[in-house]
């Protein structure tokens, strides 16, 4: 019999809690990640008040320097720790795949200076369309169509760009390049980015509509991902008949592998929390696992190095935690964590190699305290033990510490 009938894992994308031991091997604009500290630096520079996470014990997590504006709790309502990554990458897919039990020894490729001519030329030859070279770099998805959408409408060129993650994205106006044509181009791009030196996690079709100054991305987005290289705990759960619910980009990250119910993409963190709450309320969801990603921290504020915006985004999530609690059952377990860091005060614009926090809460807890410090995959090992399935490659369960 399961200790918890339902477990809900919420990933606060990029909310790291201090430099990892191997941060000296990871860089931002030539600066090693050794002094990165997403939560710590936001707390120091912008002020951070997250009373609901603080009550669970966020301020009690072991750190060289305590979080400046987050108090410790003498009698927290949950259990906390921080977890270290073993995989050789600090991107979204690597973090999530490791959380679900995999050790990624060959990280995906990222292209901070844009894609090489060889790839661009192949796409041009296949599609019969030119690529706007000036867009070929890490770019905000909305900014890139604002900057190059008018030109595309005139010329029919492709907007090819990337991000901090191992992705190639192609944006096209639906009236200029039909969606089906865009999909065919993306399928081809997928076929040429399956091995080094261009091993990419996802190819994303990004259709948009509108007029210059008022472009809008449409729901016809399509992701061409790669599945995890072996079964994760999601697969073990699904194979055992345990329902799995994906909220946000989780389904894309795992290419649908091990996901039995995809609840759709998030328009924003707030929309993602709404979807999570709707998932919690589903009458048929009496047992199983939900997995939510909230990406605004990372996409809107981490990469843009905006500590005040990041702070406000954390406040927004914390303010809505009581709603999540109110929709949980007595025997539910909530796990709040991250997938990497993205210190908005740091050099460069890339992710940062950090520990991630872990907060565990259940109305059924009679105890509280610290969970032994471990690794990302301990989360999936705990989920696996709870539901009586095997772990994946790595991970040590902390289920026995939750009283």
From Swiss-Prot:
InterPro entries registered for this protein in UniProt: Alkaline_phosphatase_core_sf, DeoB, Metalloenzyme, Phosphopentomutase_DeoB_cap_sf
EC code(s) of this entry: 5.4.2.7
Residues annotated for Mn(2+) 1 binding in this entry: 13, 339-340
Cofactor: Mn(2+)
Keywords, sorted A to Z: Cytoplasm, Isomerase, Manganese, Metal-binding
Catalysed reaction, written as an equation: 2-deoxy-alpha-D-ribose 1-phosphate = 2-deoxy-D-ribose 5-phosphate; alpha-D-ribose 1-phosphate = D-ribose 5-phosphate
Flavoprotein is among the record's keywords: no
Function per UniProt: Isomerase that catalyzes the conversion of deoxy-ribose 1-phosphate (dRib-1-P) and ribose 1-phosphate (Rib-1-P) to deoxy-ribose 5-phosphate (dRib-5-P) and ribose 5-phosphate (Rib-5-P), respectively.
Stated name of the protein: Phosphopentomutase
């Amino acid at each position: 019999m399961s200790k918890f009938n339902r477990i809900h894992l919420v990933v606060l994308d990029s909310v790291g809690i201090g430099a990892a031991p191997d941060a000296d091997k990871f860089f931002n604009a030539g600066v090693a990640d050794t002094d990165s500290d997403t939560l710590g630096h936001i707390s120091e520079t912008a002020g951070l008040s997250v009373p609901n996470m603080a009550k669970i014990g966020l301020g009690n997590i072991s750190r060289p320097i305590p979080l400046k504006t987050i108090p410790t709790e003498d009698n927290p309502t949950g259990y906390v720790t921080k977890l270290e990554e073993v995989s050789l990458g600090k991107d979204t897919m690597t973090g999530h795949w490791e959380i679900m039990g995999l050790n990624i020894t060959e990280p995906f490729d990222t292209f901070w200076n844009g894609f090489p001519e060889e790839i661009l030329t192949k796409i041009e030859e296949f599609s019969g369309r030119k690529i706007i070279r000036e867009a070929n770099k890490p770019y905000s998805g909305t900014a890139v169509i604002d900057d190059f959408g008018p030109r595309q409408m005139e010329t029919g060129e492709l907007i090819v760009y990337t991000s901090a993650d191992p992705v190639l994205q192609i944006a096209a106006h639906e009236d200029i390049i039909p969606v089906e044509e865009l999909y065919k181009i993306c399928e081809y791009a997928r076929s040429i980015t399956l091995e080094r030196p261009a091993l990419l996690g996802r190819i994303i079709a990004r259709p948009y509509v509108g007029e210059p100054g008022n472009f809008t991305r449409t729901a016809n987005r399509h992701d061409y991902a790669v599945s995890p290289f072996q079964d994760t705990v999601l697969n073990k759960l699904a194979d055992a008949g345990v329902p799995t619910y994906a909220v946000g980009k989780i389904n894309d990250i795992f290419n649908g592998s091990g996901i039995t119910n995809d609840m759709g993409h998030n328009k924003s963190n707030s929309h993602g929390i709404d979807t999570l709450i709707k998932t919690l309320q589903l009458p048929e969801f009496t047992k199983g696992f939900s997995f939510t990603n909230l990406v605004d921290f990372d996409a809107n504020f981490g990469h843009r190095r905006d500590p005040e915006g990041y702070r406000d985004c954390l406040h927004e999530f914390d303010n809505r935690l009581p709603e999540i609690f109110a929709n949980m059952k007595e025997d539910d377990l909530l796990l709040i964590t991250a997938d990497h860091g993205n210190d908005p005060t740091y050099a460069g614009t890339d992710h940062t190699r950090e520990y991630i926090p872990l907060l565990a809460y259940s109305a059924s807890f009679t105890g509280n305290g610290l969970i032994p410090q471990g690794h990302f995959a301990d989360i999936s090992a705990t989920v696996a033990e709870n539901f009586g399935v095997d772990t994946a490659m790595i991970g040590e369960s902390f289920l026995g510490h939750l009283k």
